């Protein structure tokens, strides 16, 4: 089994850019950024429970890792940069925390490397379970209206919230709930030590208005890139700045 994906071919010799979206997003989330790199072959994935992979279920991060590796193998992708936002960033960090022969670099935007104490894990597990129950039972428009009131999205204005609620409400609530719990931050290892031992470049992008993840970034052994005029979803808020940042990273 492999993940649903869209492919844009590039020029021979360039490593692939493999894009992973955030929770409730899909393969199109990174397209505007990826289109700025026509020389590089690009793979845009739908994570389990999302988009064309909505019917694919996993139990944990190990299941996601297996699917991701199988998908890369199926496209004969042997040299690649892994680029992920939020949930996609956590998937990318989990995947990269184990030896991966073909990985040329890791780029994460607003992804959490893992909780560091049992109390925080329990609180997160309870929180994610409550959200999952709402995704299963309530109209998605109402759930997402509340979802985007969370502190991490504080930089959004009313119009931005309304647009995101409309976009995300196209999802399947039951499959979102399953993925939310399977990849809960409560079930994720603290990846800081394993990522520090990596043998590839690790770049971390963060919106300047995203105070929570700016603080988290300081705990990582990664090159930090602040994206101006952006909150948690930097590539949506300021795609031009993210494109410029990626161009600089990929040219180095």
Swiss-Prot record:
Pathway it works in: Quinol/quinone metabolism; 1,4-dihydroxy-2-naphthoate biosynthesis; 1,4-dihydroxy-2-naphthoate from chorismate: step 3/7; Quinol/quinone metabolism; menaquinone biosynthesis
Primary enzyme class: lyase
Disulphide bridges: none
Keyword Lyase: yes
GO biological process: menaquinone biosynthetic process
A single MF term (Gene Ontology): 2-succinyl-6-hydroxy-2,4-cyclohexadiene-1-carboxylate synthase activity
Known role: Catalyzes a proton abstraction reaction that results in 2,5-elimination of pyruvate from 2-succinyl-5-enolpyruvyl-6-hydroxy-3-cyclohexene-1-carboxylate (SEPHCHC) and the formation of 2-succinyl-6-hydroxy-2,4-cyclohexadiene-1-carboxylate (SHCHC).
Family of this protein: Belongs to the AB hydrolase superfamily. MenH family.
PANTHER family: 2-SUCCINYL-5-ENOLPYRUVYL-6-HYDROXY-3-CYCLOHEXENE-1-CARBOXYLATE SYNTHASE (PTHR42916), PROTEIN PHYLLO, CHLOROPLASTIC (PTHR42916:SF1)
Record-given protein name: 2-succinyl-6-hydroxy-2,4-cyclohexadiene-1-carboxylate synthase
Organism annotation: Klebsiella pneumoniae subsp. pneumoniae (strain ATCC 700721 / MGH 78578)
This protein's encoding gene: menH
């Amino acid at each position: 089994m492999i993940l649903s994906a869209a492919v844009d071919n590039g020029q021979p010799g360039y490593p692939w850019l493999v894009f992973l979206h955030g929770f409730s997003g899909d393969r199109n989330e990174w397209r505007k950024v990826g289109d700025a790199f026509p020389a590089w072959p690009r793979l845009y994935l739908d994570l389990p429970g999302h988009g064309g992979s909505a019917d694919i279920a996993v139990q944990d991060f190990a299941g996601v890792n297996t699917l991701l590796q199988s998908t890369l193998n199926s496209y004969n992708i042997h040299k690649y940069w892994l680029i992920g936002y939020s949930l996609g960033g956590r998937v990318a960090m989990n995947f990269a925390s184990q030896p991966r022969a073909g990985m040329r670099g890791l780029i994460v935007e607003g992804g959490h490397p893992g909780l560091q104490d049992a109390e925080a894990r329990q609180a997160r597990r309870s929180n994610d379970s409550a959200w999952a129950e709402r995704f299963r039972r309530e109209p998605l428009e109402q759930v997402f209206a509340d979802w985007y009131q969370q502190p991490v999205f504080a930089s959004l204005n009313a119009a931005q919230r309304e647009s995101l609620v409309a976009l995300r409400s196209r999802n399947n609530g039951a499959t979102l709930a399953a993925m939310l719990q399977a990849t809960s931050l409560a079930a994720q290892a603290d990846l800081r030590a394993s990522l520090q031992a990596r043998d590839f470049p690790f770049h971390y992008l963060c919106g300047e208005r995203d105070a929570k993840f700016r603080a988290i970034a300081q705990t990582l052994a990664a090159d930090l890139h602040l994206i101006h005029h952006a909150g948690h979803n930097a590539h949506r808020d300021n795609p031009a700045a993210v494109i410029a940042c990626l161009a600089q990273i990929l040219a180095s």
